[in-house]
Amino acid sequence: MTEMNQTAIRRPFHRRRKTCPFSGTNAPKIDYKDIKLLQRYISERGKIVPSRITAISQKKQRELANAIKRARFLGLLPYVIK
């Protein structure tokens, strides 16, 4: 019983950091016309999901936010979801 407790103390669980889905070789391009891609990063209430939840890099998060705002302005995405 004590051996099991000691191994748990020595090796704590480390959560692996997620990588940005938009950086890499086969990464999708952020485009304001790609509604299916943009909808994955909008909450149920219509808000843009923060990068700490989606693990998107800061640069790509800004691009994504601008694409979502542009799509909203053009009427491709709703501002508020009821």
Curated annotation (Swiss-Prot):
Query: What keywords are assigned to this protein?
Result: Ribonucleoprotein, Ribosomal protein, RNA-binding, rRNA-binding
The alphabetized list of GO BP terms reads:
translation
Keyword RNA-binding part of the UniProt annotation: yes
Which molecular function GO terms apply here?
small ribosomal subunit rRNA binding; structural constituent of ribosome
The record's Gene Ontology cellular component field reads: cytosolic small ribosomal subunit
Q: How does it assemble?
A: Part of the 30S ribosomal subunit. Forms a tight heterodimer with protein bS6.
The molecule here is called: Small ribosomal subunit protein bS18
